[in-house]
A protein has these predicted regions:
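Conserved, mostly hydrophobic/aromatic
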Residues: 25, 95, 143, 161, ...
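Aromatic/acidic polysaccharide-binding cleft in carbohydrate-active enzymes
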Residues: 283, 287-403
Length: 506
């Protein structure tokens, strides 16, 4: 296995394009799960170290949220429609208390409004069109008016709204009926705008496979109907079909270019309609694998691959929402173990996975006003307005031995006598709770003591040094992700204090 040695010279006169929207939105399991304590503990951890602005999930109108109620009077036989906001208020309160605004997904169908019995997932979300579109529109409008009354109109109208989820899959939308989805979109769009025209509404929220066909047809439809759609949404997953084994699905990663190609196609399709040229694209779901039981999600390989994604997803996309923040998630039922290949950044037991830190590192790049001074296949480096340098370095590989270790020699402009270098390292040797869990015997239900050890193993390795010449050397083993901060530093030793003498042990 060969090592790769690369030299990078930072030139402050160069401003490099880099749109870092890492914290705009994150995904969640269905909204009803937000009533669980462990769900909120995981969300607290994510918000403390990353701090997303929006959250998006399925199940807004599903029966466990109990918003839509249809009652029949036993004496008169008269039907009455009622709206119950008890649970949705609890969920929204929890989000807003944690600094999160919802990215509302309109779906799935309340059972008593549905035109059919088709459901999806362990929790049986109904995925058929409404039996009565007027009732569907009233449901949307009543909910929005309630939210505006409770949280304030000026706030709520800023919440993006997406119509449905992955209608190009027959499991998510009955027969993947494109014409019927377009009807749903149009009716929903104007129902929302009738409440307040400032709401921003988009779709079609499609996933890969038939995405090009659907997005092209969607843009033709809104153009023909003269619908002033506010943004386009799609999903982005980057593995091949999984190989099912027991409770798990093992999937191969796509190459970088294959993973990004369909996103470029989406941009081209939208811009081919002059009236919509430049329209925002929101990637409302992305991850490596699209299944919630892919062991890849728990690995350092996932963290490094996502680092490369985050370095480029802002090129042409307004936002990109990782699916999901945590592993309280029940699409295929309740998982058997803490490391079951769940989508989340956090494993059950509040154990940060390596990818958690990829997001935290990219968020650190934008904590201060800055410009990007370097971006390539292994790094993103920014300079803050107060003169610091911050960077995320990564060496992602698809297969063992693809690149070996990458040694980066970074040359920064030396304008002071010394710099203080701080690094945070995540790799398979230093921050790998999955390996510790394996070495414990892969307990399905770890004890409290085991969970504490797993949590301890899940933190980056901290490094520090004083740099006098502006040169920094960082070694990146396969699938490593390293965060660095470099800032000017002047030693202010107390009278008589000599650190070198202390370290001589004399």
């Amino acid at each position: 296995m060969e090592m790769k040695n690369l030299k990078i010279t930072i030139d402050n006169s160069k401003k490099v394009s880099f749109n870092n929207n890492v914290d705009f939105c994150v995904g969640t399991g269905r909204m009803g799960l937000a009533l669980q304590a462990e769900y909120l503990r995981q969300l607290d951890l994510v918000q403390k170290y990353i701090g997303f602005k929006h959250i998006r999930g399925h199940g807004l109108f599903c029966d466990d949220m109990a918003i839509y109620q249809k009652r029949t009077d036993q004496k008169t036989g008269e039907e009455t429609i009622e709206y119950n906001y008890t649970y949705i208020d609890m969920v929204m309160d929890s989000y807003l208390e944690r600094g999160l605004e919802p990215f509302l997904e309109l779906g799935f169908m309340p059972y008593k409004m549905a035109s059919g019995d088709q459901t999806i997932f362990y929790w049986k979300g109904n995925t058929t069109p409404p039996a009565d579109y007027e009732e569907w529109k009233k449901l949307i409008q009543n909910l929005l008016r309630h939210l505006m009354s409770r949280y304030g109109s000026e706030r709520v109208v800023t919440w993006p709204i997406e119509v449905w989820n992955e209608p190009n899959l027959p499991g998510f939308w009955y027969k993947a009926d494109m014409e019927e989805y377009f009807k749903l979109f149009k009716e929903s769009f104007y129902a929302v705008k009738a409440v307040d025209s400032r709401f921003r509404v988009g779709g079609p929220a499609v996933c890969g496979g038939t995405d090009e066909k659907w997005i092209s047809a969607f843009m033709d439809f809104v153009s023909k109907e003269k619908i002033p759609v506010d943004f386009v949404t799609r999903h982005h997953y980057t593995t091949e079909f999984p190989d099912p084994v027991g409770h798990y699905g093992y999937a191969e990663l796509q190459s970088d270019e294959a993973g990004f190609a369909n996103l470029k196609t989406t941009r081209h399709i939208i811009d081919s309609h002059p009236e919509y040229k430049g329209l925002q694209i929101h990637i409302t779901e992305f991850n490596t694998s699209y299944i919630p039981n892919c062991p890849l999600h728990d690995t350092n390989q996932n963290a490094a691959y996502i680092a490369k994604q985050l370095s480029r997803l802002g090129d042409g996309n307004e936002s990109y929402s990782y699916w999901t923040f945590g592993d309280i998630f029940e699409e295929q039922g309740v998982p058997f173990t803490p490391f079951h290949g769940g989508f989340g950044l956090v494993a059950n037991g509040c154990i940060p996975k390596p990818t958690f830190w990829t997001f935290a590192f990219f968020k650190s790049l934008k904590e201060k006003a800055s410009i990007c001074v370097h971006r390539d296949d292994f790094s993103v480096i920014v300079k803050t307005d107060d003169g610091e340098y911050r960077g995320v370095l990564f060496n992602r590989v698809n297969h063992r031995g693809d690149t070996g270790t990458v040694n980066l020699e970074l040359s920064f402009p030396a304008v002071t006598e010394s710099y203080s270098l701080i690094t945070k390292r995540v790799d398979e040797e230093t921050c790998n709770p999955l390996k510790l869990w394996h070495d414990m015997g892969e307990p399905a239900n770890p004890s409290k003591a085991q969970i504490e050890l797993l949590q301890m193993s899940a933190w980056p390795q901290l490094g520090s040094s004083l740099v006098s010449d502006g040169k920094v050397n960082i070694s990146l083993p396969e699938n490593a992700v390293v965060y660095l901060e470099l800032k000017s530093c002047k030693l202010m030793s107390d009278r008589g204090y000599d650190f070198d003498k202390v370290m001589q042990y004399k």
